[in-house]
Amino acid sequence: MRPTPTLAEFLHAPLTTIRQVAPATMVFSSGGSRRKAALANMSAAGEEYARWSHQQLLKCLELFFSHGIKHLFLPMLLPNQFQETTPNYREHIEQWVAWGAASQTMLEYYQEHNWRVRLLDTQYSPILADAAQRLQQPYDHPDQPTLWWFVVRDSEDPWQIIFQAAQKTVFKTRSQAIEAIYGEPIPPAELFVSFGKPQVNHDLLPPLLVGELQCYWTQKPGYTLSEEEFRQILYDFAFLRKTWQVDKTERTQAALAFRQHWERGPILGLGQQLGPFWYPQSTSIESEL
C-alpha cells in the first residue's frame, strides 16, 4: 500500500498520478457568471459576455478531463433560468447553449481534444434537438472522455425521465435503468463541485447517477477554478475523506487528542449577506485555540 502523499506533493505530482485517484464521474455546476462579468466591468448581456464566459468554461473542462474525469455532467439550463424575466435573457438562452455546445467550432474543438459530447434535454426543443443531433459524430467511442451537457426545464422533469424509461424498457436493476436512460453504462457520480450556497437538489444531479457524492462549493463566481484549487479538491476527496474503518475499536479514543475541535466545532453552512448575495461565515477554529 502506497503512503498517503502530502498536499504539497500532490499539488506538484504528474497527471498520471492524479488520474489514479480521480473519480470516473463528476458533476460541475457553476454559477455567478453574471456576477463575475460585473466584477470585470462587463455587461452581462449579449454575445461578448457569452463568448467571454464560454472561454472560461472550456478551460475548466480541459482541467477536469486532463486530471482523469471520464464522465463530466454539466447542467447548463435549470428551471429558475426559464422563469427569469431579465430582459434579453430567456429568449436567447437556448441559442446560447446550442452555439456553446454544438457550433462547428465546438465540434472541431471536441475532436481536437478527443472528447465525446452529448446534450440531454428534459423536454423537446427544436433548437437543442438539432444541437444534440450535431454532436453525434462518427468517430465517437465509449472509451473517450465524455461531456454531458444537460438541460432541466421543470423540477418534475427528472422524475418524468425515469418514469418514461420504465414504460419503454423493462429493467430490474439500477445499472439497467441507467443504461436505458443514457444509452450506456455510467458509473455513479462521486464528486460534485458547485458555487455559492451549499445546497443540492435533483435539478442539478443527473437521474439515478448519485453515488457516494462528495460535495464542494467554491465562492469565486463564474467558471473560475485553478489547477491548484481542483487538485486541493481531489486531494481532500481521495485522501482526507477516507476515514471509515472496519474495526473502530481504537478509533473513538483518537478524538480525545482534538477535544476542543469537537466540543467547539463550527456549523458548516452558516452564512452572511453581502448585499443581495449569500457568503459563508468563517469556520476556522485553529486561530482561537
UniProtKB/Swiss-Prot annotation:
Keyword Hydrolase listed: yes
Listed InterPro entries: UPP_synth-like_sf (IPR036424)
Catalytic activity, as annotated: (+)-kolavenyl diphosphate + H2O = (+)-kolavelool + diphosphate
GO MF annotation terms: hydrolase activity; transferase activity, transferring alkyl or aryl (other than methyl) groups
Top enzyme category: hydrolase
Keywords, comma-separated and alphabetical: Hydrolase
EC number per UniProt: 3.1.7.12
Keyword Coiled coil (UniProt): no
Family: Belongs to the diterpene synthase family.
Function recorded in the entry: Involved in the biosynthesis of (+)-O-methylkolavelool. Catalyzes the biosynthesis of (+)-kolavelool from (+)-kolavenyl diphosphate via the release of the diphosphate moiety through the nucleophilic addition of a water molecule.
Name this protein carries in UniProt: (+)-kolavelool synthase
Species for this entry: Herpetosiphon aurantiacus (strain ATCC 23779 / DSM 785 / 114-95)
